[in-house]
Amino acid sequence: PLKLLGLTSAVAIIDQALPDREPAAEVWHGLLVLLDTITDYDEYIWLAAYIRWEIGFLGETGFKLGLDKCVVTGDVEDLSFVSPKSGCAVSDVAGEQYRDKLLPLPSFLTSKGFKAPKEFSEGLQLTEYFFKRHVFGVYNKPVPSPRQRLFERVEMLHAD
C-alpha cells in the first residue's frame, strides 16, 4: 500500500542520510507527526504532509528551502518556481524568461493551495532534486530505493 511505502521511504531517508547515533530530535518529532498523518488522513493530506516533511528534513540536514517569498522581487504572491541553485521561490513574472531552467513549485506549498494531484509528483521531484544535490550526491550515494518507488507509485496514481 502507498501509505506503507511513504513510511518506508521516510525511514530509508533518515537511515541513509543521517550519521549513526547522532541526535536528531527535530527529525524524530517530524517523523512522529508524519506517522500520525499517514495513519489518520487520506492520500491527499498525507502526501502533502510527506513532501513538507522532506522539505523540513532538507532544512535539518543543512539545506533549507526558501519557499515563502520570491528571491528576486520579494513578492509573496504568484510563486511558481524554485531556483535550483538557491532553493528559493521565484514568482511567475520574475521566472517567466527562465522557466526552462527553474523547478516547478507545486501550488499546495504556496498560498494558492492545492490544485491538482500531479502536484504531488512535482513536489517529490522538487525534493528529490535537492536530495541528490545536497544530501546523497555529496557522498556519491543514490536516493534510497524506497523513495524512488514512492515517486514511481505516485506518478502512476496521478498520471494525466
Question: Where does each model-flagged region fall?
Answer:
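Non-catalytic alpha-helical scaffolds and adjoining flexible linkers that form interface surfaces
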Residues: 1-160
